[in-house]
Structure formats: structure tokens, C-alpha cells
Amino acid sequence: MATEVNTLELTRDLLSFNTINPPGQERQCAQYLGKLLEDGGFKVAYYDFDESRTSLIARLEGRHDKPPICFSGHLDTVPLGAESWSKDPFSGEVDGNRVYGRGASDMKAGIAAMVGSALRLQKNFPEKAGITLIFTAGEETGSQGASCLAGLNQVLGQCGALVVGEPTSNYPLVGHKGSLWLEIETTGITAH
């Protein structure tokens, strides 16, 4: 059972997967993480909202009835952009104290940190609350993976605390911006 990972090496491995969205193609990256987490004792389930657009949920049951700590992030990245890169965007090249690659900060290093933390928690505190990792596809173009999971009955479950690894200029936050879609219908007399 694997219980430790080198977070930098895991970041570099994740950067080697081209998950630029569109088209996304997160399945291989999700399966790579799923295997690592299964080896660490987690139960892993995969959810596709489209072909090769795979999200995953990995769970480690706790030893009591408290809700688990949950970690969440996304597997896809934004496009490379018009400017050419000085380093291969899929190499995970390390230069000094920086690692370069598409998605390094948003958010493959965050996912590597979450996986490393979850595996350490599992190893060092096995009798405590459970751990759930939720890694979604399609965040960069409308959060389709998260919407898919939210639409499935009783897939996500409860969480005692949620850690979202989106970059926030290295400041821990208790809240973060998001989006909300509303449809409102009113009746009455039109006037101004």
C-alpha cells in the first residue's frame, strides 16, 4: 500500500498530461490519480460527463460518524495562449524553486498537494475522520464535471470541512468567488 508521494514529482507527472480545455481529455489523468489513491487504500469511483471527460471521487472511510474532510480541485487547464513558451508546457521542468508547465499553479500542484496530504493523513491518523477527494473535469469552461456530480443522487455526500486548492495568491481564505445561475419569474403590472 503506497502511503507517501513526492509532491513535486507528482506535480511533474500531472503536468505531463495534456488536459487543455477545450477539449479537456481528463480521463488518463484521473485514472493515474485513481490508481495512486487506490494503492493508498482509497475507494475510487469515476464519473464521465462526456467521452474522456472524467471526474473522480476517492474516499477513505473514517472510524467514527463525523463527516469527512474533503479536498476538491479540477484536472483541466486553460489553453497555452498565443505566446510561445520558453519551456515545454508539458515537461514539468524545475528551474530553481519553480516548476513550469500548463496548469502548474491552476491547479495541478494543488491537486498533488491534496493527494500527498490525504495519503499522509491516512497513514498518520487512520483512526480519525474520513477523507474524500473530488477532482473534476471541465472546470475551465463551465464546471461541467462538478455539475454532473451535483446532479447525481447521493454521490457527493456530506463533508465536515472542504479545502479547495484554487490559487489565491498564497493566502488561505474562508470563502472564494464562484458563480450562481438564477432564473426568476415575476408577475405583476409593468411600470417604471
Show where each model-derived region lies.
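Metal-dependent amide/peptide-bond hydrolase catalytic core
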Residues: 1-2, 45, 183-191
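N-terminal helical capping/dimerization or prosegment-like subdomains
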Residues: 1-81
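A short small-residue
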Residues: 11-14, 93-98, 186-192
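Active-site nucleophile and cofactor-binding loops and adjacent substrate-binding regions
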Residues: 47-50, 103-107, 138
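Active-site metal-coordination/substrate-binding segment of hydrolases
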Residues: 66-132
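Residue-level marker for buried hydrophobic side chains located in beta-strands
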Residues: 69-71, 163, 189
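Histidine-centered active-site/metal-ligand motif
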Residues: 74, 176, 192
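Acidic/histidine-rich catalytic neighborhood of metal-dependent amide-processing enzymes
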Residues: 107-181, 185
